[in-house]
Amino acid sequence: MLAVVWNFGTEILVATNPLTEIRNIRIGKADAMRHLGLSPYPAKSGRTHYSKAVVDQFAELEGLEVTVAGRLMSFRKQGALAFAHVQDQTGRLQFFFRKQRVKPTDATAGWLGFADIGNVDLGDIVEATGTVMRTERGEISLMVEGFRLLTKALRPLPDQWAGLKDRETILRKRYLDVILTPESQERFASITRMVAAIRTFLNGRGFMEFTTPAIQPQYGGGTAKPFKTHVNALGCDMYLAISHELYLKRLVTAGYDKVYTIGRYFRNEGIDRSHHPEFSMVETMTAYENYEYNMDLIEDMFRFIAQTAFGKTQFNVRGHMIDFANPWKRLAMADAVLDKTGVDFRTLATVGDAHEVLRRLNVAEAEFPATIGESMVRAFEVAVEPSLIEPTLVHGHPIEISPLAKPMASDPRFVERFEIFIAGMECGDNWSEQNDPVSLFATWKKRYRPEERDSGEFHALDLDFIEALEYGLPPTTGIGPGLERMAMIFTEQENIDDVIFFPLMKPSISSFNAATYGVEERPMAPVEDLALTLEEFKVMLAEGSLMPTSKVSIKPHVRMFPAGSRNRVSGHLEVEGIAHQGVIHLSGYTATMETIPDMKLEAKKLGAMVESVVVEAIKVANPHTQIKLIWAGETL
């Protein structure tokens, strides 16, 4: 609430939200600046140097006049002296004020004098012109002679020493996280360098960058549930791109041999630690080559990015030290499954035989695919994928899941395709393109089911693309690694939200903002789509960001899957009954063992963790909460 009112007899006391008072005071200071003839929001800065340049080039700049601008992060006044630290995108620099050296307030020049410096607050954007010097304590500083206010901040920054702890706030107000946390600022800066390195690498290999449509009359190039929109000017429905692949192939048909696009992709599907509905990819197409060319290309590109954008080749990826200087492994999918299960899917006679393998891998029968090839892929996902730690190129996918790829001449049940796996995570998909228009049309027509148009399994009939192929597409191959997955690897993050500056979240309008701007309050959006760790959940409970209601239910889930020669057990929780939230998913624990685990014992372990960690945290947040622990629909 904006204000709380107590009525003591005839006396009424009103307690105003402290943020309201601070905001009003700062608005008053902005008005005071105007009364002095100074704009609190001038249009231009006279900056000549960034803070880091002043520090790095001190030997050349000492005693010279420079102008530095940035956000005021600290300010300390001691009589006729004052000290401040100003932050820009390169770092921080100290401003040193002597009353007699600072130019007086001057509306014409825009200077704010020492006597009026009280109109400046932490968080304001300021500018100083002065002489580069070193203080008696040895700190490189700027002896201020002219001082300007460039932007009056109306809201105070959170505690810069504690930083932001509430994950909901970090994701919604990433700008605050970056202002307060140098590590976050550097992480997103490094991602821009990564994208620049990709362009440099591809341009150096002779590729040409093209812009391809994000709004498409027919989505294609993959299987995913699309976002639909309506174009009023054309009077028809269209789709946001799930892929740009088919447009790149049109470019190759037009005669451009090496093309690429760095575009936005939209898939109306789930949100978790490695998936987001809107994401970026770099897609390439190379004429007169096959998928083996791209195996070398993608390996070289990752190594170039590591060295160019990050200055190293070793990265901690999901707890594993990966060295991109080492050659990548290459592995046939059928051989990988054979190695882990002892079954060669290439020799299976019936889909029932394939299902028996999945049954031994504890795959639920409801998830059994309809073909041997698709069953092999499911076995790969369960038995092989988690063990692919070192960068690995897995090739030889079944044709059932690869309608756009060219079949292998040696065995047409499989296609010339490979996927990239790093630290157990799929990071890109690549293949030799099917350029036979008759064969491709037959495949598409066989899979075409109009009733599934808006589902994730619909295979569209893009007749315009088929027509383009009939004019002749040369032998072509393409790659398509996701930029967010790459950023997770190179910045050593485990959650995709931490490499997306503006992650997609439900709209939220706080009570303070509703009162301030005269709009309707929209409570904090649920965090059910966030994959929270137990520690994050505890912190949000302790801070009051999450509040348990009178009744909370906790559903533990334990799953086992092979991890190389060992077995991995993973436990997670579903929590219901947190105020204003839906179901919250919590990652619990993982354990790896040589033997087949006792799942009942593992369930008890997870239950004990729930009792000692989750239940205790909920009870501290709300001692009156009744907690029910549920396993497989039954109360334990």
Question: PLM features: what roles do these ranges have?
Answer:
Residues N7-M524:
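Class II aminoacyl-tRNA synthetase catalytic cores and aaRS-like
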Residues H557-A563:
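Short, surface-exposed ligand-recognition loops at beta-strand->loop->(often short) alpha-helix junctions
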Residues G571-V575:
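Short linear proline/tyrosine/threonine-rich motifs used for host-factor recruitment
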Residues G577-K604:
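Intrinsically disordered, low-complexity regulatory segments enriched in Ser/Thr/Pro
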Residues E602-K619:
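Extended Gly/Ser/Thr-rich low-complexity repeat segments
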Residues P623-T635:
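A short amphipathic beta-strand at an alpha->beta junction
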